Amino acid sequence: MGISYSVDVDSEASAKAMLRERSISLKHSKAIAREISGETVADAKEYLQAVIDEERSVPFKQHNSGVGHRNDIDGWDAGRYPEKASKDFLKLLSNVSNNADQQGFDADEMVIEHVAPHKVGESQGRKPRAMGRATTWNATLCDVEIVVTETEEVTA
């Protein structure tokens, strides 16, 4: 049984990749996915590297209570620099670029058509407490899928 994606795409004009069971925040992943969707692969890589370097922030349009305001976001105020999730998204973009190159496409010019994070479970953990007790301390696991397609040239 193969890996299933949440969208059906034409394999002749697209490439896809997936991160499996990564210990990253689902909320951060959703915010990053919303921001890079529709961008070219090269632009998305540049953006994520700027997020890691804390030069540009990711707008948090959901789950944003208590999130500080950033002045580099146009049309929005709340944002953060989710470094851990951004590094995993860079790995995902590198993977989909390699898949696109293998299929004969120019990877950096392809457009991100679909990117979706999904919660797939929790990694069980325990945190020791006083008197020999322990509290569960679980980590969320996420899958992230991405599909890139060729840009269609518009002739005027």
UniProtKB/Swiss-Prot annotation:
Part of the 50S ribosomal subunit. Belongs to the universal ribosomal protein uL22 family. GO terms for biological process: cytoplasmic translation. GO terms for cellular component: cytosolic large ribosomal subunit. It comes from Halobacterium salinarum (strain ATCC 700922 / JCM 11081 / NRC-1) (Halobacterium halobium). This is Large ribosomal subunit protein uL22. This protein binds specifically to 23S rRNA. It makes multiple contacts with different domains of the 23S rRNA in the assembled 50S subunit and ribosome. The globular domain of the protein is located near the polypeptide exit tunnel on the outside of the subunit, while an extended beta-hairpin is found that lines the wall of the exit tunnel in the center of the 70S ribosome. PANTHER family: 60S RIBOSOMAL PROTEIN L17. InterPro entries: Ribosomal_uL22, Ribosomal_uL22_CS, Ribosomal_uL22_euk/arc, Ribosomal_uL22_sf. GO terms for molecular function: rRNA binding; structural constituent of ribosome. Keywords: Ribonucleoprotein, Ribosomal protein, RNA-binding, rRNA-binding. PROSITE patterns: RIBOSOMAL_L22 (PS00464).
